[in-house]
């Protein structure tokens, strides 16, 4: 994320939930583009998960040590590449809540036995810039932006270089922090529903989430799936880093 000077791997080595393996969102994104956090090719994803010892039938619980941002994006990546949605979840509140509840952490090294992971891309879960542009007029789907209202309305400079301020025409704004509690757990489904009802019909399944670089959009996508169990998360993965590029 822009303006964040942290080393996730160092934090992981210092303490983690017993048995947890480390996943680097930045390093495991597409290295062939200058856009941040773009999805890797399917063959690269297979290599990444195989090297981590993850199998297709594994139950995956994802957590992070931030505002659930990385864990929600990782959750989305697993779904995009075909992991069973019933086998992928996010630890509510992440490591911070885990530690506050005095649960066990350690710094033990994890021995990994390589697997042979096979991906199956679901390209219906992503939108590209051309599809976003076409939708401005035909309005086939709603675009909901997870950034702050100040960034959405162009009242503050974008934190990334060579990216203008503003938002996608005809999109809606729901800052992702509005569906989280102060401890970074998700609000109750009734409260989440109220937030979405203010801008869209929560029975609508054709919702595409956007943000700065395709990360916080996944927080909203997960939240929306909690109040609409028929929804499959859809992301404009280039997000404003691509759309607002100068």
Where are these regions (language model features)?
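Cytosolic catalytic domains that perform sulfur/thiol-centered chemistry
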Residues: 1-246
């Amino acid at each position: 994320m822009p303006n964040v000077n942290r080393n996730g791997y160092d934090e992981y080595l210092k303490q983690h939930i017993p048995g947890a393996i480390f996943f680097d969102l930045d390093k495991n994104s597409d290295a062939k583009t200058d856009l941040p956090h773009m999805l890797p090719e399917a063959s690269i994803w297979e290599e990444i998960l195989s090297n981590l010892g993850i199998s297709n039938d594994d139950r995956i619980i994802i957590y992070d040590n931030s505002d659930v941002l990385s864990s929600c994006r990782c959750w989305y990546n697993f779904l995009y590449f075909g992991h069973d949605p019933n086998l992928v979840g996010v630890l509510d509140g992440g490591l911070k809540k885990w530690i506050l509840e005095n649960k066990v952490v350690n710094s033990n090294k994890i021995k990994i036995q390589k697997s042979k992971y096979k991906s199956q891309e679901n390209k219906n879960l992503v939108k590209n810039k051309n599809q976003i542009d076409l939708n401005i007029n035909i309005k086939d789907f709603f675009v909901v932006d997870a950034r702050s209202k100040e960034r959405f309305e162009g009242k503050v400079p974008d934190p990334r270089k060579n990216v203008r301020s503003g938002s996608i025409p005809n999109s809606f704004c729901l800052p992702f922090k509005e569906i989280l509690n102060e401890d970074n757990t998700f609000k109750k489904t009734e409260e989440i529903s109220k937030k979405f009802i203010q801008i869209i019909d929560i029975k609508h399944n054709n919702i595409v989430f956007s943000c700065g670089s395709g990360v916080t959009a996944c927080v909203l996508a997960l939240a929306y799936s909690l109040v609409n169990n028929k929804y499959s998360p859809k992301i404009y993965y280039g997000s404003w880093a691509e759309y607002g590029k100068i």
